[in-house]
Amino acid sequence: MNQDHPECDSEELTQNSPETDPLKVEVETLRGEIASIKADVLRERAELENQRKRLIRDVEQARKFANEKLLGELLPVFDSLDAGLTASGSEPSPLRDGLELTYKQLLKVAIDNGLMLLDPVGQLFNPEHHQAISQTEVTDVEPGHVIQVFQKGYLLNERLLRPALVVVAKQD
C-alpha cells in the first residue's frame, strides 16, 4: 500500500474490481448470450422433433384412411350382393355360387384393407355403432339387445363408416 497516496490504492481496487473490469463485464455478457443461444437451440430442436412426430402421425392417418372413400362407395355393392344371396334362397345353383364367391372375395379384400362388418344380432345396442329404427316387444330376448338388422354397418380401422340399422328389443 502506498501510504503517501492512499487514494491510489482505492483507485487501483476500483479499476480491478469485477464490476468495472471491462473484460469481465464482456465475458459475463457473452456467457449470457451463449446461454440464451443454447436455450433457443434446444427450443428449436424440440419444435423440430414435434413437427417430425406430427408429420409421421399425419402420414400414418392418411395411410390408414386412404381407402375410406372407395370402401364407402362399395357399401351399396355389398348390400346388393347380400340381398341377392338372401333372395336366391339356400338352394345351390351356379348363379348363387358365383354370387356368393364374388361377395366373399370382395369382402375379403375390403377386410384386408381395414373394413370391419357390423352384424349385431343378439348384441347389446351400442349407439356408437348402431342406429335403432324401431323397438319391438319380445319375450325371449333381453331388453336393449338387437333382434334384427335391416342394414349391416361397417367400421374402417375402428372408425364408423356406416352404422347398422337395427330393431331393438324393448321391455314388455
Curated annotation (Swiss-Prot):
The keyword Disulfide bond does not apply. GO terms for cellular component: cytosol. The keyword Magnesium does not apply. Keywords: Chaperone, Cytoplasm, Stress response. Residues 1-23 are annotated as: Disordered. GO terms for biological process: protein folding. It is found in: Cytoplasm. InterPro entries: GrpE, GrpE_coiled_coil, GrpE_head. It holds the Pfam family GrpE. SUPFAM superfamilies: Coiled-coil domain of nucleotide exchange factor GrpE (SSF58014), Head domain of nucleotide exchange factor GrpE (SSF51064). GO terms for molecular function: adenyl-nucleotide exchange factor activity; protein homodimerization activity; protein-folding chaperone binding; unfolded protein binding. Participates actively in the response to hyperosmotic and heat shock by preventing the aggregation of stress-denatured proteins, in association with DnaK and GrpE. It is the nucleotide exchange factor for DnaK and may function as a thermosensor. Unfolded proteins bind initially to DnaJ; upon interaction with the DnaJ-bound protein, DnaK hydrolyzes its bound ATP, resulting in the formation of a stable complex. GrpE releases ADP from DnaK; ATP binding to DnaK triggers the release of the substrate protein, thus completing the reaction cycle. HAMAP family: GrpE. This is Protein GrpE. The lineage of its organism: Bacteria, Pseudomonadati, Pseudomonadota, Gammaproteobacteria, Lysobacterales. The gene is grpE.
